[in-house]
Amino acid sequence: MNNHIEALSYYLGAFVDELTRLNVCDVVISPGSRSTPIALLMEQHEGMNTYLHVDERSAGFFALGIAKAKKRPVALLCTSGTAAANYYPAVCEAFHSRVPLIVLTADRPHELRDVGAPQAMNQINLYGTFVKQFTEMALPEASEAMYHYARMTTQRMIASACLAPQGPVHLNFPVREPLIPDFSLESLWDKGRGEYTGVVQQGNAVMPSEYVDSLVGRLSHMEKGLIICGDDSHSEIATFATQLAEKTGYPILADPLSNIRSGHHDKTMVIDCYDTFLRNELLKETWKPDVLIRFGGMPVSKALTQFIKKQTKAVHIVVDESGQWRDPALVATEVVQASDIAFCSALIEKMPVMKKNDWFRMWQHINEKTKETLREMETYDTAFEGRVITDIVRVLPEGATLFASNSMPIRDTDSFFFTSDKNIQVMANRGVNGIDGIISTALGASMICDPLVLVIGDLSFYHDLNGLLAAKLHELNITIVVVNNDGGGIFSFLPQYEKKEHFESLFGTPIGLDYEHVVTMYGGSFSRVNGWEQFREEVQKGATTEGLHVVEICTNRDENLTLHRKLWAKTQDVITTSLQGESK
């Protein structure tokens, strides 16, 4: 028995210690029995920050939010059985949004598998192709070789999570009873520790000089170009993309998640209203770029995606550090395996300065005309969902974070988050674009990003109510704006809306819930606003005070659709008139 406890303590102690040596210092733990030894050792280690979250599905997204904000791997720990299965949605999102998670699942030992033992199921490769790597850890043994193995496996798995493209990894730990480690053991954290840690260093891929020279030569003869920046671009992409735009004269179509629309950098070349004006048929037929250079994930805008698809004669360059073929438009002619920064730097160094021509001025002019028209919605007294975004940005302080939920909030952010000199970070879960786990992801991010305001629809809010527990347990500061249109507002914009007979029951899905009591249960404050002045006051108050604050604004789905269509129609008229004037 003593030999088992000693092996358990030293073996798992070496694993936990190696996590901290590799700067994985945050772990989200859901309570359970089989994970007891790892949980206790993590709580005991002075280098580890532990966060309890009872619901595993919410816990997974909470860890995802911390990792997204810190841009470092975060660990997740749960017991065996369906607890591990509840991590699946967050693991899928982490994989597709390239967020490093270290998923740790406890398991029954091999003799208790496939024999009907309680709380035992097949956890081998549980997450399938949605993790970069899986390993089944060996059972604890008391030997220097096994302590070294525990550390080396930790190093290998963290390296896998952190190398481009980043993503989740899964370690499955079979353990036998008894499960309580012995903290009185001498040198508990030192077993198997070498002088150095095995860290894989990844440098920026060097751009081949021959390719750079060839590309510079081609671009020098292409006056009509576009730079498109999507989600998960490099944090310094704003500086380098704007320099490249200045050199080439190509406008930057900046997705809100690229974080190029706001900040202290020069935004002369930044186009922010393309989602609206690229709906114009005349413009789509007459504006034909020679080349498109894209960084990051595919932008939110469907209008932009459709525009890209139509450019069948253009050169399409997709820059991706991992070399993955991320081209849902199916038009890429070149995929360059390099970091955004390495690519931009190489071109900036060798590109001659190309004068701003009519091409850039056309985009800039139409962008300003569109923005002028869209800003008319700031005069609407009606609870228009697009104005939610502009009014939040108006009162957010410098350095704040806006987290946009999926469905309508991220689309309204795309349409109505205009360029700003304030430094406001925009975040979202755009890996697989689900509405689950949004509250939990935002709460995880709020541990690093303060103040943080989440904009979320009522159905997405309902979907992750359990996530609010983290705000109470860990005393987090967050303001949640619930846009309550009593249902799935995005479906009003889709063809399903025309099927009136079954629309409300299958797509509109009103649930008629009063969230005030739920928010109070989790220790938060709740306000239901009437009017835009009160809305701005409540958001501003929430962003400058501690705790959980939920601000509900009630909207009407049909009215919201009508107002969106009214704005779009007016902008199309303005754009068409402007284009026809230019052609005369």
Curated annotation (Swiss-Prot):
Binds 1 thiamine pyrophosphate per subunit. Disulfide bonds: none annotated. Keywords: Magnesium, Manganese, Menaquinone biosynthesis, Metal-binding, Thiamine pyrophosphate, Transferase. GO terms for biological process: menaquinone biosynthetic process. The gene is menD. Catalyzes the thiamine diphosphate-dependent decarboxylation of 2-oxoglutarate and the subsequent addition of the resulting succinic semialdehyde-thiamine pyrophosphate anion to isochorismate to yield 2-succinyl-5-enolpyruvyl-6-hydroxy-3-cyclohexene-1-carboxylate (SEPHCHC). It is an enzyme of class 2 (transferase). This is 2-succinyl-5-enolpyruvyl-6-hydroxy-3-cyclohexene-1-carboxylate synthase. PANTHER family: 2-SUCCINYL-5-ENOLPYRUVYL-6-HYDROXY-3-CYCLOHEXENE-1-CARBOXYLATE SYNTHASE (PTHR42916), PROTEIN PHYLLO, CHLOROPLASTIC (PTHR42916:SF1). Pathway: Quinol/quinone metabolism; 1,4-dihydroxy-2-naphthoate biosynthesis; 1,4-dihydroxy-2-naphthoate from chorismate: step 2/7; Quinol/quinone metabolism; menaquinone biosynthesis. It holds the Pfam family TPP_enzyme_N. Its cofactor is Mg(2+); Mn(2+); thiamine diphosphate. Its EC number is 2.2.1.9. Homodimer. It catalyses: isochorismate + 2-oxoglutarate + H(+) = 5-enolpyruvoyl-6-hydroxy-2-succinyl-cyclohex-3-ene-1-carboxylate + CO2. It comes from Bacillus thuringiensis (strain Al Hakam). GO terms for molecular function: 2-succinyl-5-enolpyruvyl-6-hydroxy-3-cyclohexene-1-carboxylic-acid synthase activity; magnesium ion binding; manganese ion binding; thiamine pyrophosphate binding. Belongs to the TPP enzyme family. MenD subfamily. InterPro entries: DHS-like_NAD/FAD-binding_dom, MenaQ_synth_MenD, MenD_middle, THDP-binding, Thiamin_PyroP_enz_TPP-bd_dom, TPP_enzyme_TPP-bd.
